[in-house]
């Protein structure tokens, strides 16, 4: 019995080491890190990896599960905030901070590389929350009325570009960009826009 318990404990520790190593490497280098590098970093063999995670997709799911859950929780908190504008700001700050600190998460949410299926499931869960977040801020008169849920991906696309270009020299520079962007989203600053938002079909074609 003790031998069985020891084996189970060893297996659990090995799984934790694999997930921890993958989390660190995905966050630093993105989801294209080879699994051989992950096992080497964990000090384990490929056989151990495949016993726990037969595919890289399964390993990525385990690594990013908590990150996805935190984004959904941030959206839920924003929707529940009494001040809808403050809730929207907090959500954007938390979401972009997650992008800035976790390149793997940013890759997956941008539909780059592995993990696209899990990312789409997360997006399907969070979309109704984002719509409600935007609706509440507009109902309170703090978010410009012509901002649509379909405009929100543009916020992340452009912010991710800032993150990519400045990460090595000023890791938090995206916060300055977000400040400029938020000023443009305030209802009192609104001026007519020259073009309508992308449709859902157009957004899907950009992925």
Feature annotation, model-predicted:
Residues 1-41, 58-61:
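Basic, helix-initiating cap at the start of DNA-binding domains
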Residues 1-5, 128-139, 165-207:
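C-terminal peripheral helix-coil segments that are non-catalytic and often amphipathic
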Residues 115-160, 164-168, 172, 176:
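Amphipathic alpha-helical packing segments from all-alpha helical-bundle domains
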Residues 62, 73-101, 114-118, 123-125, ...:
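Hydrophobic alpha-helical connector segments
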Residues 20, 69, 85-100, 175-183:
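Amphipathic alpha-helical segments that line or abut small-molecule/effector binding pockets
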Residues 43-53:
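Short hydrophobic/aromatic patch on the recognition helix
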Residues 107-116, 196-199:
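Short linear capping/connector segments at secondary-structure termini
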């Amino acid at each position: 019995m003790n031998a069985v318990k020891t084996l189970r404990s060893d297996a659990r520790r090995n799984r934790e080491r694999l997930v921890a190593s993958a989390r660190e490497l995905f966050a630093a280098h993105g989801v294209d890190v080879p699994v051989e590098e992950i096992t080497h970093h964990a000090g384990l063999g490929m056989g151990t990896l495949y016993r726990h995670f037969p595919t890289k997709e399964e390993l990525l799911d385990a690594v990013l599960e908590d990150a996805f859950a935190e984004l959904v929780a941030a959206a839920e908190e924003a929707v529940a905030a009494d001040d809808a504008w403050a809730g929207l700001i907090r959500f954007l700050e938390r979401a972009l901070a997650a992008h800035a600190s976790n390149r793997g998460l940013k890759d997956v949410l941008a539909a780059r590389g592995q993990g696209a299926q899990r990312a789409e499931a997360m997006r399907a869960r969070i979309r109704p929350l984002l719509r409600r977040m935007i609706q509440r801020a507009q109902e309170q008169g703090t978010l410009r009325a012509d901002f649509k849920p379909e405009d929100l991906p543009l916020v992340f696309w452009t912010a991710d570009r800032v993150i990519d270009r400045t990460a090595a020299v000023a890791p938090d520079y995206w916060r300055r960009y977000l400040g400029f962007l938020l000023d443009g989203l305030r209802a009192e600053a609104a001026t007519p826009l020259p073009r309508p938002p992308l449709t859902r079909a157009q957004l899907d074609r950009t992925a």
